[in-house]
Amino acid sequence: MHTLTPAITLKTLPQGKHHCITTIFSPLGLLTFFAKQGQSLYYDFREALIPLSLGVYNLDHSPPKMRKLLFAEVKNTFTTIKSELPLLQAAGKMTQSILGSQWQEKPSQELFSLFLNFLHRLPESKNPEMFAATFLLKLLQYEGILDLSTTCAACKKTILSASFYRHKGRKFCIEHSPESAVMIENEEEKILHALVHAKRFQDLLHLSNFHLEFSEKITLMFDSVFHEDKHKKLPQSNGSA
């Protein structure tokens, strides 16, 4: 069975001396494939295996074996992002958020389009770290786990204080905040709502010029939902192909 899909390369790991295993993000979700001789300098599709490469990938799939790369054509290497460290770090944060939150082969057309658009607009941002944090918020919203109500998840009372706490996407009053919750000021909550509801990237770029401390809080909020030790079961490697 063949799969032809646009995708963005997220990571490539060596497999033996000459081969590699690559994970891409596509409208079909995360897909992982085996590239025979992928580490070779003369491999035809080597550029398509480099992280942060947008391309079209033709994969062969014979379950339970891992997919194999048949052909790839690179469409965009995001050269500007890769040439500036702050942009590369921001793109890396978004990449890791996809790897840490999505399951293999979970269809994600909307999220793929969102991720691609964020990468395209990232070089325009004056605050790449906050722009990447905005993507984390959008991802939480996409997954339906970002509480935008005005009530505490524990006591169900309206939060009237100047600050409150967020944990695992939910809101808590000061009295019922979990130990590892992140404190949010009302001003920050207003920015959060504006970012989540913004429909135009020009608005997102403007709103992302907020202070860096808030981006750190967003990252902590995201990490409280999606942990690094989340395991994804991959198909059987076809190292002998």
Swiss-Prot record:
Task: Note the SUPFAM superfamilies from the entry.
Answer: ArfGap/RecO-like zinc finger, Nucleic acid-binding proteins
Q: Which residues form a coiled coil?
A: none
Which UniProt keywords are listed?
Answer: DNA damage, DNA recombination, DNA repair
Q: Name one Pfam family in it.
A: RecO_C
Gene Ontology biological process terms from the UniProt entry: DNA recombination; double-strand break repair
Quote a single Gene Ontology cellular component term.
Answer: bacterial nucleoid
Q: Which InterPro entries match?
A: ARFGAP/RecO (IPR037278), NA-bd_OB-fold (IPR012340), RecO (IPR003717), RecO_C (IPR042242)
Role description: Involved in DNA repair and RecF pathway recombination.
Its family remark reads: Belongs to the RecO family.
Q: What name has this protein been given in UniProt?
A: DNA repair protein RecO
Species of provenance: Chlamydia abortus (strain DSM 27085 / S26/3)
